[in-house]
Design a protein with these regions (language model features):
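Short, glycine/acidic-enriched loop or turn micro-motifs at the edges of active sites
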Residues: 12-14, 118, 155
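Acidic two-metal-ion nuclease catalytic site recognized across multiple nuclease folds
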Residues: 161-231
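A short, structured active-site edge motif that brings together acidic residues
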Residues: 111-123
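Acidic, divalent-metal-coordinating active-site segment for phosphoryl/phosphodiester hydrolysis
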Residues: 148-161
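Conserved non-catalytic scaffold segment of RNase H-like nuclease domains
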Residues: 1-111, 125-147, 173
Length: 231
């Protein structure tokens, strides 16, 4: 079992790291098996948080209104991580968002990691659900605030220690850190239909937007359309 690592989790506005944003990062730095430092911070998104995300996470637009922008928070988190191994539950999801966020500001985020979800899928194949909540319930691990980044990260650290206690000796390869990978896809240009619809909305709403139809991406156009429709 690793004695030093970082367990982390992010809360986001959706599932696509190229189109959605991180709104909260939670992490704990473990040294010699004990929590040595904590990282908990909101990020102010460029778009409003949907009611569905608020219902899931409890994070409201008011809670992030005074938060720092992505570039500042992500840079601080990268410094916090140092050279540590990252541990997460479905860590590829959290890593994909962190990598895209870092890349957007010209920063590199290359990490080794351990995924408690993958460990559980192999070691506990008989369990119907391998979600963090289900595994915490199975092992009686308390998670005071599920779907909030720091509390999920803390629960993940406890789950990792529990799984290592029961299964690492039987299958040590399952617990070895691997290189985390995520290939950032090149943004796709907005479709002619999106541009036409966006122009029509701008005329109807009588608003002024600073945008270039020749360079706007598909995801940016979708976000602008959503914001105009909500308004």
């Amino acid at each position: 079992m690793l004695k030093s690592y970082i367990a982390f989790d992010v809360e986001t506005t959706g599932l696509n790291p190229l189109e959605n944003e991180i709104i909260e990062i939670g992490a704990l730095k473990v040294r010699n098996g004990k929590v040595a430092e904590r990282f908990m911070e909101f990020i102010k998104p460029t778009t409003s948080i949907s009611p569905a995300i608020t219902s899931l996470t409890g994070i409201t637009n008011e809670m992030v209104a005074e938060a720092r922008p992505r570039c500042s928070v992500v840079a601080d988190f990268l410094d916090f991580c140092e050279d540590d191994v990252l541990i997460g539950h479905n860590v590829s999801f959290d890593y994909s968002f962190m990598k895209c966020s870092a890349a957007a500001d010209g920063l590199s985020f290359e990490k080794m990691g351990i995924d408690t979800l993958k460990i559980a899928q192999k070691a506990l194949s008989g369990l119907e659900s391998k979600s963090l909540g289900s595994l915490c319930e199975y092992y009686h691990i308390e998670n005071k605030s599920a779907h909030r980044a720091y509390h999920d990260a803390l629960a993940t650290a406890k789950l990792y220690q529990t799984l290592a206690h029961y299964f690492e000796e039987k299958d040590p390869k399952l617990f070895k850190p691997i290189q985390l990978t995520y290939k950032i896809k090149k943004p796709q240009p907005a479709t002619p239909k999106q541009i036409a619809f966006l122009n029509n909305l701008i005329r109807k709403k009588r608003v002024k937007l600073s945008w270039d139809p020749d360079t706007v991406t598909r995801s940016e156009a979708s976000r602008m359309i959503d914001d105009l429709l909500k308004g």
